[in-house]
Amino acid sequence: MSSDWIFGACAVPDARMRSAALARQEQLTKPPGALGRLEHLAVRLAAWQRTDRPGVQRVWIAVYAADHGVAAEGVSAFPQAVTGEMVRNFARGGAAIAVLARELGARLEVVNLGVVNDPGDLPRVRRAWIAPSSANICEQPAMTATQLRDALAAGADSIAQAKSCDTQLFVGGEMGIGNTTAAAALGCALLSQFPQAMAGAGTGLDAEGIAHKATVITRALALHADASSPLERLRRLGGFEIAALVGAYIAAAQAGIPVLVDGFITTAAALVATRLNPGVREWLLFGHRSQERGHAALLRAMDAEPLLQLDLRLGEASGAAVAIPLLRSACALHNGMATFAEAGVSDA
């Protein structure tokens, strides 16, 4: 199966519903613009969902787990075994995103794409196994062409399931020791940034560890300097879970499902997705600005204004999940407030 589907046309938001939602906002019992960005969020959701009364009750959260060969370079404060252990923790409901998904009433899908410490078959975990780990990007490409194709397809499979459940919002998350290094390398390659500007603390590195991480990224960029296309850069510098996120974001935009992007790693995937298929950008909201050093540069590259800034750097889709009540509030206000005529209140 080819990956040419990633270049297919994206859905187009409904301009008529956008206009209807804007008109309703102008009639609600408040000064124009008094609810700030909440008004714009409601209008965007109305256009995406093709209704003048949008909602964010049916949420699909997919967390993609995969290990990285670059972890062998000592770029994380945690051992590689943690990835597989966290997959088990997701399945048991003990991880942060599992708690948040329960609180939100959201559907949580965990996808095991390949971890060194494989927990095997687990309830509530989809096994889309590619390999125990990507390759070390300091020595060779992270993925073969076949592995990249399979990872992209794994993300698209999530969207097919989400669409069948009439999902109103998709949120992607990730788990993988070493994946901030891969995301930073991708960011450097796509934005012509210096590694020192993109390498951050990740799981908790000190200044010396961050400097070492930047050196590792420099080596990887030098090895893969001839990679010119976004897809080839993803293949050489990314990872299974990052590629799955790229596939999910593209498939969601093609299916007309809005996406709430999480933190640093998911934003790197979103940047790749928009470089591969520019129509994806119209379907993206950004949940928060993380504490990870390179996140601000990625957000600027997509002219993205995140909803929250809480100094988070956990990943797992946790920051995006925390922002979902904000979207629900925007919809509740839009749908539930009275108009001036309904309330018998004088308009300006």
Swiss-Prot record:
InterPro entries for this protein: Nict_dMeBzImd_PRibTrfase (IPR003200), Nict_dMeBzImd_PRibTrfase_bact (IPR017846), Nict_dMeBzImd_PRibTrfase_N (IPR023195), Nict_dMeBzImd_PRibTrfase_sf (IPR036087)
Gene Ontology molecular function: nicotinate-nucleotide-dimethylbenzimidazole phosphoribosyltransferase activity
Catalytic activity of the protein: 5,6-dimethylbenzimidazole + nicotinate beta-D-ribonucleotide = alpha-ribazole 5'-phosphate + nicotinate + H(+)
This protein's UniProt keywords: Cobalamin biosynthesis, Glycosyltransferase, Transferase
Active-site residues per Swiss-Prot or TrEMBL entry: 316
Name of the protein this chain belongs to: Nicotinate-nucleotide--dimethylbenzimidazole phosphoribosyltransferase
Pfam families: DBI_PRT
Disulfides per UniProt: none
Annotated EC: 2.4.2.21
Entry's Gene Ontology BP terms: cobalamin biosynthetic process
Pathway participation: Nucleoside biosynthesis; alpha-ribazole biosynthesis; alpha-ribazole from 5,6-dimethylbenzimidazole: step 1/2
Function: Catalyzes the synthesis of alpha-ribazole-5'-phosphate from nicotinate mononucleotide (NAMN) and 5,6-dimethylbenzimidazole (DMB).
Gene3D superfamilies membership: 1.10.1610.10, 3.40.50.10210
Family statement: Belongs to the CobT family.
Gene that encodes it: cobT
